[in-house]
Amino acid sequence: RLGYLDIIEFKSDEFEWIKLAYQHIHDKPTLVGLPSSVGLYHPPFFAYLLSIPVSISTDPKFVTGFVALLNLTGLWLLYIFAKRVFSLRLAWVVVSLVATSPWAILYSRKVWNPDCLLPFMLVFYITLASYLERPTGFKVWIMAALLALITQLHMSAWFLFGPLFLFAVLVKAPLSIRDVLIGGLLFALLYTPYITFHVITDFQNLNILSSLERPTIFSRSNLASAIDNIKWTYVISSGTGLSYSLGNEFDTFYRTRYLTLPYVFFSIVLFVAAFGTIRYLVLSVRWIFQRREWLDTPSSTKILILFTLILFLMHLAYFLFKVPSLPHYNVIFYPILFIIAAKVGVDAYKKASSHYIKRALLGLLLAILCSNLYVT
């Protein structure tokens, strides 16, 4: 993540984000970020975040290094989260997978708002796991503030509210009206600059959404986008699909770098993640409809149910709201599929009755990690 910062992608958007951060420090407060792919302005939090390194230097390598450091912090947070909720063994496996994954590295070293999602998502998940074990109002406030920051980093995070609400209902979260109101006020407070911009501009930018021509829900193009978004969720959690980033030179790169064997292991990761998703989706449905006692349910099971709700309901929302299929729209799902794949692998290792099977599974993990590092 911190190596070869001189070959990072740095084009107009990256320059404009640094420019906004610089203006925020030296000129006037930044109220909005850059326009999104649908024309709606991003909220300004990413510019505020970049103002930390920009206050020292505007060198693209330095600012990108800051983003990479944030993501290294994200790996540490992932270790804490996985160890606390699941096990030490799973924590090491999932951190190894994320640390070496080509796509995860790609989305951790660029001056781009989606590249900063992972550490904030993990702080949110850690706080949520703590709340499930010991509910307090203060943790609700922290989660509300984190959601305000996460939704500012990328608008796809707005679709998190559906699965989170359903999850809160399922686990019968002891939310008081007071805590919800305070959390809502904190959320609104962190959106004050963005709201201010829209008020002083008579909400002209918001009118763009109503004027956009979008396909109908059940049109062929929207169905194709929905399917592609599901594919991208799994592709960017493996090493497949790198042709999207390497472009026209990918075929030559593929042949000259002998990528056939690594792609076999990438496909295995993709298959295990897909299998794990189906497995935990079925388990979640059974658990919900059997009306198990949630107080006696392990935190790890609750978190896996939340993850399946996020995967299912967010992709349903992508379909209903006609979200175009782009890989960075699926960074919001990090590190869910890595955890699911690691859980399947660790469970298989525990249940293996033969030392040969256990050694084979360890060898497979090592081959996957080596393939990740080789391609990276």
Label for each model-derived stretch:
Residues 2-4, 15-48, 52, 215-220:
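Extracytosolic helix-loop segments that constitute the early lumenal/periplasmic catalytic or substrate-binding loops
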Residues 17-23, 158-289, 300:
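Transmembrane-lumen/periplasm boundary regions of multi-pass, lipid-linked membrane glycan transferases
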Residues 61, 65-86, 122-123, 127, ...:
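Transmembrane-helix motifs of polytopic, lipid-linked glycan transferases
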Residues 166, 185-188, 345-376:
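Signature aromatic-anchored transmembrane alpha helix within multi-pass, membrane-resident enzymes
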Residues 139-154, 165-166, 186-189, 315:
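Membrane-interface alpha helices of multi-pass inner-membrane proteins
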Residues 84-86, 124-142, 150:
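Membrane-interface transmembrane helices that cradle and orient dolichyl/undecaprenyl
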Residues 107-108, 117, 302-349:
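Hydrophobic/aromatic-rich transmembrane helices and adjacent perimembrane loops
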